[in-house]
Amino acid sequence: MKKNFLSVLLIFTTVFAFAQTPCNNGEAGGYECNGYDLMAHIPLSVFNTTGANDSWGWTDPDDGKEYVLMGLENGTAFIDISDPVNPIYLGKLPTATGTTVWRDIKTYNNYAFIVSEASGHGMQIFDLTHLRNVNNPPVTFTEDAHYSGFSDAHNIVINENTGYAYAVGTNTFGGGAHFVNIQDPLNPVAAGGFSADGNTHDAQVVTYIGPDADYAGSEIYIGSNGSGQIISIVDVTNKSNPQGISTLSYSNSGYTHQGWFTEDHRFFLLGDEFDESNVGFNTRTIVFDLTDLDNPVLSYEYFGVTPAIDHNGYVKGDNYYLSNYAAGLRVLDISDIENDNIVEIGFFDTYQDNNDASYNGVWNVYPYFESENIMINDRSGGFFLVRSSLLNNNDFSAVNTFVVYPNPASDELTIKSNGDVISSISIVDVVGKVLFAESDLNSEIKNIDISSFSAGIYFVNINNNLTKKVIKK
């Protein structure tokens, strides 16, 4: 579907192109949305760059202030978002060597670790406490330390529990994991690597708490191995002797790009970057059941509502936050993933031209700020900060005005008003089928018989304004 694009919005050269625009009637500041408000936007021109890529976040432990670490083609930008409606661009750490499309950032304690595919870049180390007192921003920062154990890298992963970084896609270990001890951040030390499963494009490393008792407390590396079209699961507890556990493949593979564990480490959600364009189906998220790490199995394939390519995705609680290129940020409810139920519950689309299977739009999102603000890094659109409409002040009254109970429910669902009159109610299932709808109610309480509904997730919309998720037992 062709989307309306307000090109006039791009002529702003000030830092704040727009600020706090609620999502009303599917639009916020000229961007299509569902359930997510636009808090702020900074175009790429402000950062003096032509492209953005990866991103991460840091929260200052001293005062709780939140900062965005934004990857650019020519360096890394730092943005203070402690006032989300008025973010402050503090400055940039220039690239260590040349410019490149690819840059990746992670944090450990109060330090940022930055890699790039620029030749000879190595790993930049930056003390984030420099962001506390910046006079006359934006300024140009300098790195505090440098690691030259590899020339360049596609990505970096950090297990903050152990103090180890894992650079992947380097010129070492066949492009597999390159281990670095960063427990003393300004004095990183090479600690070995793993090459048996080939080049890794991206990875996640966790201290394992999942259902496989054989690996309880172990440090588990799960690599998405790009053109190798496999997932590689490795026990990296002993850095001098990492042990391959298993590999797995799947049908219609093109480029095994990136994935993330559910918080209980049972499931792994994977995105393949080429499958949408190669095969022609809608955005596919592949779910693997890793109950037994030695014998992982494909559990479920979820297909989105557009043909856009998926890029990076992250799990936080019951939600999966997906950077979906031309389709923007998509938020999926995975609370019922065990029963093969995944449903999109919201989105914010920063790319206006289309939802095609192209590489335009959102490269990365960062959903882990305690404030619940979500950073979106758009390749050409720049920095966006969004927030769930249910969390913003303008919606608090709606959230508190209506109560939906019991939840979970068995046979009957009650919607009760604590103020506003209930004028309309609709209930839809996870595929959008309307199972109940009434309008012109003008009542303060409504009981609905749901005994015929199948067990699963449903969405109750009240007055075409507030939507609440309910579970039918």
Q: PLM features: residue spans?
A:
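C-terminal tail/sorting-segment detector
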Residues: 3, 457-473
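Short, surface-exposed loop/turn motifs with a glycine/proline- and acidic-biased composition
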Residues: 419-420, 439-464
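Short coil/turn motif common to extracellular beta-sandwich-like domains
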Residues: 216-218, 407-414
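Residue-level detector of functionally pivotal "anchor" positions at catalytic/ligand-binding pockets or at interdomain
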Residues: 386-405, 411, 418-420, 433
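Sec-dependent signal peptide recognition
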Residues: 2-11
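Feature marking well-ordered beta-strand scaffolds used for ligand recognition
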Residues: 19-391
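Short, glycine-anchored, charge-dense loop/turn motifs used at functional sites
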Residues: 427-435, 458
